C-alpha cells in the first residue's frame, strides 16, 4: 500500500475519530512537539511521528497541517518525510522547510500532500530536527 493511502487512512482517523477505525491505530507516546503512532494493516506496520504547527499564518485560516516522519519496516523504508496542509497546494509555488541556514524543498506534490524526493535531503532534515531546531514550512494554497 502506498504512503498516500496510509496518510489518507491516518487523516480519516484524525478527522472522524471513529472508535472502530481508531482501534487499528496505536498511540505510542508524546515527546515535546511530536506524537508517535503505529498503524497495523494486515501484517504490515507503519510507524510514524507527527507534529502539528506551533504557529500558523494566517491564524484565521483553519487547517489540519502536519509534518510526518514515517517508517515502513516491511518495505525497508525509514525516515520518509512528508507534510500535509489541510488544503490543496499551489503547484506554481515551491514548498519549502527552513531551519536556520538549511532549506529543504518538497519536490513531490499531490493535492494536499508533499514529499522530499531525495533521500539525502531527508537524512539532512532528520539530523536538523534531531538537534531540536525549529522548522518553518512555507507553502501556498491553490487559491494563491
What is each model feature region?
Residues 6-16:
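Sec-dependent N-terminal signal peptides
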Residues 22-144:
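A generic "folded-domain core" signal
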Amino acid at each position: 500500500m502506498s504512503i498516500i493511502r496510509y496518510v489518507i487512512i491516518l487523516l480519516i482517523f484524525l478527522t472522524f475519530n471513529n472508535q472502530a477505525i481508531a482501534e487499528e491505530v496505536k498511540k505510542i507516546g508524546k515527546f515535546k512537539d511530536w506524537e508517535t503512532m503505529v498503524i497495523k494493516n494486515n501484517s504490515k506496520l507503519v510507524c510514524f511521528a507527527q507534529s502539528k504547527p506551533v504557529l500558523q499564518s494566517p491564524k484565521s485560516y483553519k487547517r489540519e497541517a502536519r509534518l510526518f516522519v514515517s517508517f515502513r519496516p516491511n518495505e525497508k523504508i525509514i525516515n520518509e518525510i512528508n507534510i500535509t496542509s489541510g488544503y490543496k497546494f499551489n503547484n506554481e509555488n515551491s514548498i519549502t522547510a527552513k531551519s536556520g541556514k538549511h532549506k529543504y524543498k518538497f519536490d513531490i506534490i499531490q493535492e494536499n500532500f508533499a514529499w522530499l524526493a531525495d533521500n539525502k535531503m531527508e537524512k539532512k532534515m532528520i539530523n536538523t530536527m534531531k538537534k531540536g531546531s525549529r522548522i518553518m514550512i512555507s507553502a501556498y494554497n491553490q487559491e494563491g
